[in-house]
Amino acid sequence: MAVICLVRPYDGQAQTSMVREHQPIKRMVTERKLKQQIDILCDSIHAGRAAGEKGGGLTARWIQSEFERLGLLKFGSSYGHGVLLGNGRFGRNIIGMLPGSKHFSREKYIIVGAHYDHLGILEGKMYPGADANASGTVALLNIAEMLSAFRNTGRDHDYNVIFVAFDAKESNMAGSKRLWRMIQNGELVNPQSGARITKDKIAMMVNMDQLGCTISPLKSGRKDYIIMLGNDSLKPIKRDMLRICNRTYAIDMEIDYTYYGSKNFTQMFYRLSDQRIFVDNGIPSILFTSGITMNTNKTYDSPETIDTEILRKRIFLIYHWLDRML
């Protein structure tokens, strides 16, 4: 109870009010909508979303149209930012910003990302990548939509949120490395203030990679679980926030802060996705995942393997956690 009070002291009436104010916003995220978005990303027109290929480019265009629909601010003239892949090929990170409160410092940022690329077509076979990582991509889009809608009700957050759909994770994480170089080189500029976004202004990076499956459960065997890695990189006062949100908003998922209880696998898996470059540069970084499964990087990682009911719950939990962290 002491931790809860330190983080944000709410009495029962205030908690009830807080839960209610999110309900209209959460109704925007339906299982049907999640399925439709995953189907789009896994459609044959996107050809497995390989970085630098036509299918990857079409996927980038679709994500840009979603960012436009949500009203996210562009960095420069476009949401798309090139990623050099070699051999004359280019990928594209899609980057947009949701502004923070006018009443607080405008130069504080949290980066929220998910990679949208996958393996493409290999030896004539398409790899749809439904869990890896259409699931994380639709989580990114729906969290951006909910936070944007919440802002439109008059509720601002202290931090600016930079949403990034990374390309080229499957190409040695070239997309996230490119974003970091933009930050290092002063290329990432606040679209409102014109100030350069530097390392010292980034409070946290949050990555979502493989959130859609339930076939690799934790010890209890429950389907409704989520794995959060990097929690110990946060300030101690914030480390219980996911559990607080899980309880406060009656989401009631099983939470693990390790990769299936193994210290070695936790350390290894924590470095296998786009948060790695931020970890290496001292930025507190979080990975949300449901874990690698026997479908990962297989042709049968397809939309019908996604549990949209559980994916929706995971999205809600991450959304509420972000709302409290912002």
What annotation goes with each model-predicted range?
Residues 96, 112, 117-173, 318:
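Alpha-helical metal-binding/catalytic segments enriched in His/Glu/Asp
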Residues 41, 67, 84-123:
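Acidic/His- and Gly-rich active-site-bordering loop/insert found
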Residues 20-28, 44-54, 81-85, 124-133, ...:
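Second-shell loop/turn segments in exported
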Residues 12-58, 63-65, 69-73:
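N-terminal hydrophobic or amphipathic helices/low-complexity stretches enriched
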Residues 48-99, 256:
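A non-catalytic alpha/beta surface segment that caps or lines the substrate-entry region
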Residues 65, 289-326:
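His/Asp/Glu-rich mid-to-C-terminal helical/loop segments that flank catalytic regions of hydrolases
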Residues 1-17:
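Bacterial Sec-dependent N-terminal signal peptides
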Residues 166-273, 285:
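Metal-dependent peptidase/peptidase-like ectodomains
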